[in-house]
Design a protein with these regions (language model features):
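Active-site helical microenvironments for divalent-metal-assisted chemistry
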Residues: 1-120
Length: 120
C-alpha cells in the first residue's frame, strides 16, 4: 500500500508544477507529517486513513489553490483525530496553515437545520 500512496502523492506533485520548489517541499513535508500521524488509522473500507486527506489535497490542487491550502487539506484531520496540536502544526508549517486546519475542523462541527442553511 505504501507504493500506492507514494504513487498517488507523485500524481499530486504533478499538479503542483506552478508552485515554487520550496512550496512543493513544504507540501511533501505536510504529507509525510499527516501520514505519520494517521499511521494505523483505517477508513471504513479498510484503506489507510491518509488516503482521504490525500484525495482532498488533489481536489484543492485542481482548484488552483495555494500551497498553504493544499497543506491544510493534507493536515485537515491531524489536530482533530491525532495527537497533533495547533501549536505543533503552526510551529512546523505556519500559523496560517494551522488556522486553516482548525477552521476546517470547526466547519465539520456546524449543525444545519435545513438544506437552505447548509448551502449558504
Amino acid at each position: 500500500m505504501e507504493d500506492k500512496l507514494e504513487a498517488r502523492f507523485q500524481e499530486l506533485e504533478e499538479k503542483l508544477k506552478n508552485l515554487t520548489q520550496e512550496d512543493r517541499a513544504r507540501v511533501r513535508d505536510a504529507f509525510d507529517y499527516a501520514r505519520s500521524h494517521h499511521e494505523g488509522q483505517l477508513r471504513k473500507d479498510g484503506s489507510p486513513y491518509i488516503t482521504h486527506p490525500l484525495e482532498v489535497a488533489h481536489l484543492v490542487a485542481e482548484l488552483g489553490l495555494d500551497a498553504d491550502s493544499i497543506m491544510a487539506a493534507l493536515l485537515h484531520d491531524t489536530i482533530e483525530d491525532t495527537d497533533a496540536t495547533h501549536e505543533e502544526v503552526a510551529k512546523r508549517f505556519s500559523e496560517t496553515v494551522a488556522d486553516l486546519v482548525e477552521g476546517v475542523t470547526k466547519l465539520t462541527k456546524v449543525k444545519y437545520t435545513s438544506t437552505e442553511e447548509k448551502q449558504m
